[in-house]
Amino acid sequence: MPHLAYPTTTCEGFRCETHCAVRGLAICGELGPADHEEFERLAQHVRYGPKEALFSEDEVADSVYSLIEGIARLYKLLPDGRRQIIGFALPGDFLGMAPGNRYSFSADSIGGVTVCKFFRGPFLRFIENRPQMLLRMNDFATRELSLAQDQMLLLGRRSAEEKVAAFLVGWRDRLARLEGVTKTVSLPMGRQDIADFLGLTIETVSRTFTKLEREKLIVIVPDGVRVLDPKRFDALAAA
């Protein structure tokens, strides 16, 4: 997918204390006031428009990102040019900590995101003598591994219905950390994004949504889906 130009928009006047709704979930959530003030001085608060790239696969991994607003799409390009989406990042998620000196996947904005962007060197120097930050990093890495394992199961021998249901339940549970439990599952990503995440065609995903609605498990609403029978739906997702 082609990207628009890298942004030049910084969030003038942004202050974590008054503007960040996900500070408790973010990488800085365990810092005391003095450490947090120093940490914020390292940050650039940047706004990316729809489809703008935060970073691209194989670029030098010189920055890390704490997502504070919006949804980011994480993906790799296969040798034949096809796209495999490997995840969707939510507010509070931490991105860009590559195992080597280059990013191993790409990240772009779905509908506009705001991030705290840190140059990698100063960030690593800041956390190295702060055990609470190292523990926080470990928590993020553990969660990322769990999500990767969940996707491996999704790409396994499941029917299209089971894959779509499992995706919706997993996404609903992630949203619940931000918004609380609700029967309506907001879907800012399109059907093609869901298809590229599940290893299905967009036609199969669209037919599956229609079938789930016809079976009265969900109803399709403008911003996502509403689960009509949570017990049956969760059972299908767990199959």
Swiss-Prot record:
DNA-binding region: 191-210
SUPFAM superfamilies, A to Z: cAMP-binding domain-like (SSF51206), Winged helix' DNA-binding domain (SSF46785)
UniProt keyword Translocase present: no
GO MF assignments: DNA binding; DNA-binding transcription factor activity
Sorted UniProt keywords: Activator, DNA-binding, Transcription, Transcription regulation
Matches recorded under InterPro entries: cNMP-bd_dom, cNMP-bd_dom_sf, Env_Response_Regulators, HTH_CRP, RmlC-like_jellyroll, Tscrpt_reg_HTH_Crp-type_CS, WH-like_DNA-bd_sf, WH_DNA-bd_sf
Signal peptide: none
Top-level taxon of the source organism: Bacteria
PANTHER family: CRP FAMILY TRANSCRIPTIONAL REGULATORY PROTEIN, FUMARATE AND NITRATE REDUCTION REGULATORY PROTEIN
Protein name: Transcriptional activatory protein AadR
Organism, as annotated: Rhodopseudomonas palustris (strain ATCC BAA-98 / CGA009)
Gene name in the database record: aadR
